[in-house]
Structures are given as structure tokens and as C-alpha cells.
Curated annotation (Swiss-Prot):
Residues 22-28 form a propeptide. One of its GO terms (molecular function) is metal ion binding. This is Ligninase LG2. Pfam families: peroxidase (PF00141), Peroxidase_ext (PF11895). The keyword Calcium applies. The active site is at residue 75. Ca(2+) 2 binds at residues 205, 222, 224, 227, 229. Belongs to the peroxidase family. Ligninase subfamily. Disulfide bonds join 31-43, 42-313, 62-148, 277-345. It comes from the Eukaryota. Pathway: Secondary metabolite metabolism; lignin degradation. GO terms for biological process: cellular response to oxidative stress; hydrogen peroxide catabolic process; lignin catabolic process; response to reactive oxygen species. InterPro entries: Ccp1-like (IPR044831), Haem_peroxidase (IPR002016), Haem_peroxidase_sf (IPR010255), Ligninase (IPR001621), Ligninase_C (IPR024589), Peroxidases_AS (IPR019794), Peroxidases_heam-ligand_BS (IPR019793).
Length: 371
């Protein structure tokens, strides 16, 4: 379904839910564990939740397993092309789990390198609980985000049928693609515009890279990879000065902090006139970050699906955790200041931020998957 149609469907659904709640008591079902949901079919997902929190996310941590589960959502969902369909070619099924069903094919695609590990990690849970791969990928991604302090309250809908064929290669954006290429790709996938593209990249707030630089693993995109905040949007605007590893890798540019990786697409989107002001708008604005990402994540997980035929099981997703402490949502790390910013938005100045005290340090790597 095209994004604008999807937007209308989601908006109507949310409006009807609010209206119904104001008139009559919402119809609920009570599960065996005593928790209530809007639809009885959602009860089975509590067993899945308990299992993956204990045995995949190690007690609800926002670590490597969570980061890779979030990445898997995007790589599965974005693989859809109405433009190819219009030419009589199969354009992929979007959020249909094809990357897991046809993993030997799709994880070999260049932008999906490294995802074979998270697919292998998730497959046993799919088989154990008898859910579809598409539903599980969306569920695991939503739960993973709920484990990261500061993330939105995530939504989750079921009803994705198993993919019947693999998505074509070439539909997942690469770190070395131009801004024009990436905007065109997301516009084809769901009629997303350049602003909504920036919303998608909020996921890099809780992410790391294992395969851009072959000499080093677990390189985060910002200094707070375990927290869903706007530091990613601050630190990508620092003037690039160094590489965290070997350097000179395809799709990598110099970052502004030791131990932190910066991919070419993030660097150029932060500075392109079409996206720079939206990029900067998240700095110091946690509520905008949360609202926009909550919407775009749901939209992505419903690409290729009919939202009206899906079941809302958002009740199963844990409450998101608040950002710990009383510190600012955006800040300059120790040793950094406004003079390190490469101002790109021509409409408004870069926000005034505090610099945290202490000496400048290297950003720690993300530990690999736990056995």
C-alpha cells in the first residue's frame, strides 16, 4: 500500500480508537497471565515476549541483539518496489519476512551482509512459537526498541502472511548511495519523502556497524548507542577528523569522535539542503524524535500489507523505558563545542547545548552477540 494511503488508514484507525474509547468502554480480552488485550489472538504473543526477553535480549537489554533486530526490520520492510511491479516485474513484498524465509538468498545481498547472524538467532523462536516470520521480525524489532531507554511506545500489528518468493536485489539502500538515490528508493517503496527518510534514520541512535570496516566490529553511530536520543543527530554534524579503524572503506567518511563510525549517507543527509533542517530539528527535541519515529516505524512494518486486515496487538509491547538521570536530551560530549559543528540548515541556527564535563574519551564498542 502506498505510504499516503497507509498514513490515512493509520490516522483513521487511531481516530476511531480514541472516539470509541470516549463513548463506550473498550472491549478487552483477558489472557491466561491475567493481562488484557484488545483482541484475544494477541495473548499468544506474551509467551513470545517472555521467551525473547529472557533468551534473546538477555533480560531486556538494548545491546547487539536489539540493535540487529531493529536493523532487520528495516532491511526486510524496505524491499518493495511498486515501480518494478508497474513494469511487470516482482518488486518484493515489503514487511513479509522474506529475508528470513529466503535467508540464503537475501542475506547474501551486499547491503544485508551480517544479517545472517540475527536471522539465525531469530529463526528458532519463529519455529518454536508457530508465528509467521514477518510478524516475528516486526515484533522483535518493537520489543528491542522498548528495551532502549527513550524510545517511543511501540506499536505492533499481526497478520503478515509468509513470503512466497525472495525480494529482488538492489532495493535496500547502501551506505555509499547518494542522497538522490536514497530519496528515490524510499519514495518508490512507500511514497516516503525526504523528511520521512530522516525520521527512519533515527534508528541509528541505537545502532552499531560490523561490516563497513572489516578490521573492527561493533562501532556505534553515536556516543549513547544504548539510549534512544538525539545524540546521533548532534554528532553527525561534527566536523570529521578521523576514522575509528582502517579508514578508506566504501561508504565510510571521517567521524568527529574517536571510536565512532560515520557512514557516507548519514554525513551527506545531515548536510543536504533538502534534509539538513529536518535533521537538525531533532537536536534537543526528544518529543519530536519519539513521535516521528513511532509513526515511521509502524508505517515501515506495514509496507506491502493491508493495515485494515491486520490485528492491533500493541498491548503486548512493554512500556518503553525513560532516559535515566536528569541530564539533557542533547549535549556536546566532553571536549566538543559549537565550534565543532558544521552548520548545514540555512533556516535556523544550531541549538545551544551544554558541554559535558570531563576529558574527551573514545566511544566504546558494542560487545558482540552473546552466546
Amino acid at each position: 500500500m502506498a505510504f499516503k494511503q497507509l498514513f490515512a488508514a493509520i490516522t483513521v484507525a487511531l481516530s476511531l480508537t480514541a472516539a470509541n474509547a470516549a463513548v463506550v468502554k473498550e472491549k478487552r480480552a483477558t489472557c491466561a497471565n491475567g493481562k488484557t488485550v484488545g483482541d484475544a489472538s494477541c495473548c499468544a504473543w506474551f509467551d513470545v515476549l517472555d521467551d525473547i526477553q529472557a533468551n534473546m535480549f538477555h533480560g531486556g537489554q538494548c545491546g547487539a541483539e536489539a540493535h540487529e533486530s531493529i536493523r532487520l526490520v528495516f532491511h526486510d520492510s524496505i524491499a518493495i518496489s511498486p515501480a518494478m511491479e508497474a513494469k511487470g516485474k516482482f518488486g518484493g513484498g515489503g514487511a513479509d519476512g522474506s529475508i528470513m524465509i529466503f535467508d540464503t538468498i537475501e542475506t547474501a545481498f551486499h547491503p544485508n551482509i551480517g544479517l545472517d547472524e540475527v536471522v539465525a538467532m531469530q529463526k528458532p523462536f519463529v519455529q518454536k512459537h508457530g508465528v509467521t516470520p514477518g510478524d516475528f521480525i516486526a515484533f522483535a524489532g518493537a520489543v528491542a526498541l522498548s528495551n532502549c531507554p527513550g524510545a517511543p511506545q511501540m506499536n505492533f500489528f499481526t497478520g503478515r502472511k509468509p513470503a512466497t518468493q525472495p525480494a529482488p536485489d538492489g532495493l535496500v539502500p547502501e551506505p555509499f548511495h547518494t542522497v538522490d538515490q536514497i530519496i528515490a528508493r524510499v519514495n518508490d517503496a512507500g511514497e516516503f519523502d525526504e523528511l520521512e527518510l530522516v525520521w527512519m534514520l533515527s534508528a541509528h541512535s541505537v545502532a552499531a556497524v560490523n561490516d563497513v570496516d572489516p578490521t573492527v566490529q561493533g562501532l556505534p553511530f553515536d556516543s549513547t548507542p544504548g539510549i534512544f536520543d538525539s545524540q546521533f543527530f548532534v554528532e553527525t554534524q561534527f566536523r570529521g577528523t578521523l576514522f575509528p579503524g582502517s579508514g578508506g572503506n566504501q561508504g565510510e567518511v571521517e567521524s568527529g569522535m574517536a571510536g565512532e563510525i560515520r557512514i557516507q549517507t548519514d554525513h551527506t543527509l545531515a548536510r543536504d539542503s533538502r534534509t539538513a533542517c529536518e535533521w537538525q530539528s531533532f537536536v534537543g527535541n526528544q518529543s519530536k524524535l519519539v513521535d516521528d519515529f513511532q509513526f515511521i516505524f509502524l508505517a515501515l512494518t506495514q509496507l506491502g500489507q493491508d493495515p485494515n486486515a491486520m490485528t492491533d496487538c500493541s498491548d503486548v509491547i512493554p512500556l518503553s523505558k525513560p532516559i535515566p538521570g536528569n541530564g539533557p536530551f542533547s549535549f556536546f560530549p566532553p571536549g566538543k563545542s559549537h565550534s565543532d559543528i558544521e552548520q548545514a540548515c540555512a533556516e535556523t541556527p544550531f541549538p545551544s547545548l551544554v558541554t559535558l564535563p570531563g576529558p574527551a574519551t573514545s566511544v566504546a564498542r558494542i560487545p558482540p552477540h552473546k552466546a
